[in-house]
Amino acid sequence: MASRKEALARRANRVRRHIKSVANGRPRLSVHRSSKNIYAQIIDDVAGKTLASASTLDKDLRGSLKTGADTAAAAAVGKLVAERASKAGVTDVVFDRGAFIYHGRIKALAEAAREGGLTF
């Protein structure tokens, strides 16, 4: 039986393998969720560079959020990463949820990023 970390890595690799097959050169919006914070970055896999990033630890958000571990914080990160992506000239991305299910904070971030102008 696989350990928790091995199962997490297996799920993340399965999602990323699917993303690479459908990306067609589009950058990916990668999301990571910890127990206290949430992080999002837009990565160009062809060039190997991060085009935009945002998290609940950013100075822009830290003072305005009560906590980094709720859906309101995730939505704020989604809007911020969409705003930074538009400044970088990115509008079309592939959503990389990693091993996290599309529910709760991950879903709130994705919907806020869509409202902010990203399409996926």
Swiss-Prot record:
Quaternary structure (record): Part of the 50S ribosomal subunit; part of the 5S rRNA/L5/L18/L25 subcomplex. Contacts the 5S and 23S rRNAs.
Example of a GO biological process term: translation
Record-stated family: Belongs to the universal ribosomal protein uL18 family.
Function: This is one of the proteins that bind and probably mediate the attachment of the 5S RNA into the large ribosomal subunit, where it forms part of the central protuberance.
Protein encoded by which gene: rplR
Alphabetical UniProt keywords: Ribonucleoprotein, Ribosomal protein, RNA-binding, rRNA-binding
PANTHER family associated with the record: 39S RIBOSOMAL PROTEIN L18, MITOCHONDRIAL, LARGE RIBOSOMAL SUBUNIT PROTEIN UL18M
Molecular functions (GO terms): 5S rRNA binding; structural constituent of ribosome
Cellular component annotations (GO), alphabetically ordered: cytosolic large ribosomal subunit
Protein species of origin: Rhizobium etli (strain ATCC 51251 / DSM 11541 / JCM 21823 / NBRC 15573 / CFN 42)
Protein name: Large ribosomal subunit protein uL18
